[in-house]
Amino acid sequence: MSRRPKIEEAMKRVESRYELVHAAVRRTLQLLREGEDFFVQEGGEVHKKTFAAIEDIAEGKVKIIKKKEESGSKEE
């Protein structure tokens, strides 16, 4: 049986769902640059790298860095 990513836990580390999506996309791209496979095997289960990205955020394995608002620029 496949388990779901820890979205509720990941939401505790960000201010909004938008920020979680943005961070997960950036982490997924980072994972893809590190390896060729889109899937990762974890404990006998196969998951997409997007799953691994959300897990990394939920477990605090990655640090989410926010750009500070500068005059005339948008905050990310």
Swiss-Prot record:
Entry superkingdom: Bacteria
EC number: 2.7.7.6
Example of a GO biological process term: DNA-templated transcription initiation
Cellular component, GO, one term: cytosolic DNA-directed RNA polymerase complex
Enzyme class, broadest EC rank: transferase
Catalytic activity: RNA(n) + a ribonucleoside 5'-triphosphate = RNA(n+1) + diphosphate
Family per similarity comment: Belongs to the RNA polymerase subunit omega family.
Role summary: Promotes RNA polymerase assembly. Latches the N- and C-terminal regions of the beta' subunit thereby facilitating its interaction with the beta and alpha subunits.
Name under which the protein is recorded: DNA-directed RNA polymerase subunit omega
Species of the source: Aquifex aeolicus (strain VF5)
Source lineage: Bacteria, Pseudomonadati, Aquificota, Aquificia, Aquificales
